[in-house]
A protein has these predicted regions:
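N-terminal low-complexity, Ser/Thr- and acidic-residue-enriched intrinsically disordered segments
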Residues: 2-114
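Short beta-strand element of the alpha/beta-hydrolase
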Residues: 121-125
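Catalytic nucleophile loop
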Residues: 200
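Serine hydrolase/lipase
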Residues: 2-32, 53, 109, 117-120, ...
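Surface-exposed loop and adjacent secondary-structure segments within mature catalytic domains
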Residues: 126, 137-144
Length: 316
């Protein structure tokens, strides 16, 4: 085994870099959809601290309630998040929060929303904020993923911390039951899964797992996600015919470079910069320096507000 292979890079990834701004191999994620999902992700970041949403409340009604009770300006959030909150109410006005899970043991927060106007069911994971979240982030050992539809040999191994947070206290089962119940009522709806940081990793893992339970199209749009699993995970993920992943990253975001040792990214990568974006499809040949801590070293580029500003600026 070569040195770069040991670090987690394939032979292709250790060769030359091939450029970008080409069409994605699979259908491109709609920019408006990506922006809507990021706005909902930003809303979830503030849910426990500032916001109260009853299940089946529309997003429009929720925002109207904030405005009548002192306005968005009364919230202890910055202007970027206030803007995102207002925009998501305008763009997904009849969206409903169908389920909200907040697990005290793992500090996981995840919501399930339904948009009849856009015919989609969204599962939205909150990103890393608490000490507990970072504890799961830094559990870098792998665990074999055991579920129907996966080969046992060779095993598919994923980040033990992410898997533990998703499956503790039946969170995963509750989410699957909720989504499958909504599919029974809306069989033609697309399933969208999203999150930022830890939420991005959880959305990637959840999207893969639920794609084995449903026939509907599952689209994962992750933001600032770390790597989730090994090479067998990557292969199993990218052959699923009903599963699509658009991995949105800031150019120098350090979190997207970890874990490094024998972990691999999955899906199409949309890389954001201040004045442009680049697209790396599934079969793109990347330089071995790409997405390592030698090139992705900035903690500030991990900020969800910067993702929002760049995604708003870079249209496709």
């Amino acid at each position: 085994m070569g040195f770069w292979s040991f670090l987690g890079f394939s032979e292709d990834e250790s060769s030359k870099q091939e450029n970008v701004n080409d069409q994605l191999v699979r259908p491109e994620v709609n920019h408006d959809l990506a922006l809507d999902l990021l706005r909902i992700t930003m809303l979830v970041y503030n849910y426990d601290k500032n916001l109260t949403i009853e299940e089946n409340t529309t997003i429009e009604s929720f925002v109207s309630g904030i405005q009548s009770g002192g306005g968005i300006d009364s919230l202890d959030i910055n202007d970027t998040r206030k803007e995102a909150l207002g925009e998501v109410a305008k763009n997904v006005p009849t969206g409903k929060i169908c389920k909200w899970i907040s697990d005290d043991e793992t500090d996981l927060q995840v919501g399930v929303t339904l948009s009849e106007g856009k015919k989609r069911i969204c599962v939205v994971f909150r990103g890393s904020e608490s000490r507990s979240d970072w504890y799961y982030d830094f559990m870098i050992f792998k665990e074999t993923l055991r579920m129907d539809g996966l080969t046992k040999s060779p095993p598919v191994n994923v980040h033990s911390g992410f898997l533990s947070q998703l499956t503790t206290n039946n969170v995963y089962k509750t989410l699957v039951d909720t989504v499958k119940g909504l599919i029974l009522e809306h069989p033609d709806y697309e399933i969208c899964v999203t999150g930022h940081s830890l939420g991005g990793a959880l959305s990637t893992l959840f999207g893969f797992m639920i794609s084995h339970h449903v026939d509907n199209k599952v689209t994962v749009t992750s933001f600032a996600s770390p790597r989730v699993g090994d090479w067998e995970w990557k292969k199993a993920f990218e052959v699923k015919s009903n599963l699509y992943h658009y991995r949105v990253t800031n150019y120098r975001d350090a979190i997207t470079a970890v874990p490094m040792i024998r972990y691999y990214h999955v899906g199409n990568n949309i890389q954001l910069k201040d004045d442009k974006f680049e697209v790396f499809p599934l079969d793109a040949i990347r330089g071995w320096l790409d997405e390592t801590l030698l090139t992705c070293w900035s903690a500030s580029e991990h900020n969800v507000d910067l993702y929002y500003k760049r995604l708003t600026k870079n249209l496709w």
